[in-house]
């Protein structure tokens, strides 16, 4: 395990790390706090596979991998996966689960900025899902992801839009009414409008290729992808060719 001790460590919110450390042991409980992540993971994975043209035998980095839900599923698709996170306990859980399931992948405790300094233009695909709204400087993360991916490579981001509807759905609804995630999981002030995210992307060699919303219907208890990006959304970007 490698631990980052560089100045880029400053782009870490210790309170956010502590929140996820406290519940890390239940990361792979399909009925626990991370049930929504397990439910949406097939949608995320299918989107990544379709937009990137497949990831078999490709080098893939999952930034903010947590306990490894997405990272492990990408490794099972035949990718050479590295999971990156600053939470010690989630990474321990991820390593143990990979060992139990016989899934081959690597986990590193390091900031994405530090990793980018060491591995520029190394990965074919970079994913950064449900992470940007948990760091002090999301633009710095986007710049690092752009640095990490090869020319013509793919970078995927997902986060939550910032508006009244997203606050009602992602905070009031998900945390307090439906109790899908623990109270305090999200800070609505840290949500990111698509225009902001794409603005940061445009300041890098990345170019936006596609954007799609992730929708939850509480009546049918069903998740699906769609064009509306009012709440959760994913963005597919691609680095300019050399």
Swiss-Prot record:
One of its GO terms (biological process) is methylation. The keyword Disulfide bond does not apply. GO terms for molecular function: 2-polyprenyl-6-hydroxyphenol methylase activity; 3-demethylubiquinol 3-O-methyltransferase activity; polyprenyldihydroxybenzoate methyltransferase activity. It catalyses: a 3-demethylubiquinol + S-adenosyl-L-methionine = a ubiquinol + S-adenosyl-L-homocysteine + H(+); a 3-(all-trans-polyprenyl)benzene-1,2-diol + S-adenosyl-L-methionine = a 2-methoxy-6-(all-trans-polyprenyl)phenol + S-adenosyl-L-homocysteine + H(+). SUPFAM superfamilies: S-adenosyl-L-methionine-dependent methyltransferases. InterPro entries: SAM-dependent_MTases_sf, UbiG_MeTrfase. Its EC number is 2.1.1.222, 2.1.1.64. The keyword S-adenosyl-L-methionine applies. S-adenosyl-L-methionine binds at residues 44, 64, 85, 129. Pathway: Cofactor biosynthesis; ubiquinone biosynthesis. It comes from the Bacteria. Pfam families: Methyltransf_23. Keywords: Methyltransferase, S-adenosyl-L-methionine, Transferase, Ubiquinone biosynthesis. Belongs to the methyltransferase superfamily. UbiG/COQ3 family. O-methyltransferase that catalyzes the 2 O-methylation steps in the ubiquinone biosynthetic pathway. HAMAP family: UbiG. This is Ubiquinone biosynthesis O-methyltransferase. The gene is ubiG.
């Amino acid at each position: 395990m490698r631990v980052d001790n560089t100045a880029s460590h400053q782009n870490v919110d210790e309170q956010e790390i502590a929140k996820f450390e406290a519940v890390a042991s239940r990361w792979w409980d399909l009925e626990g706090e991370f049930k929504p992540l397990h439910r949406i993971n097939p949608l995320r994975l299918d989107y990544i596979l379709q937009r990137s043209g497949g990831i078999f035998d490709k080098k893939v980095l999952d930034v903010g991998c947590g306990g490894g839900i997405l990272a492990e599923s990408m490794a099972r698709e035949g990718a050479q996966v590295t999971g990156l996170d600053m939470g010690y306990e989630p990474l321990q859980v991820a390593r143990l689960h990979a060992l139990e399931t016989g899934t081959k992948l690597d986990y590193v405790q390091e900031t994405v900025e530090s990793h980018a300094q060491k591995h520029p233009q190394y990965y074919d695909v970079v994913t950064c899902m449900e992470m940007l709204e948990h760091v002090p400087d999301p633009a710095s993360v986007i710049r690092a992801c752009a640095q990490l991916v090869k020319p013509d490579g793919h970078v995927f981001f997902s986060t939550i839009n910032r508006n009244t509807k997203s606050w009602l759905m992602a905070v009031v609804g998900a945390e307090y009414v439906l109790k899908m995630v623990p109270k305090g999981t999200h800070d609505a002030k840290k949500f990111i409008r698509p225009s902001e995210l794409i603005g940061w992307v445009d300041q890098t060699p990345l170019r936006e290729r596609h954007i799609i919303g992730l929708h939850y219907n509480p009546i049918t208890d069903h998740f699906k992808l769609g064009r509306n990006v009012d709440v959760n959304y994913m963005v597919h970007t691609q680095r300019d060719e050399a």
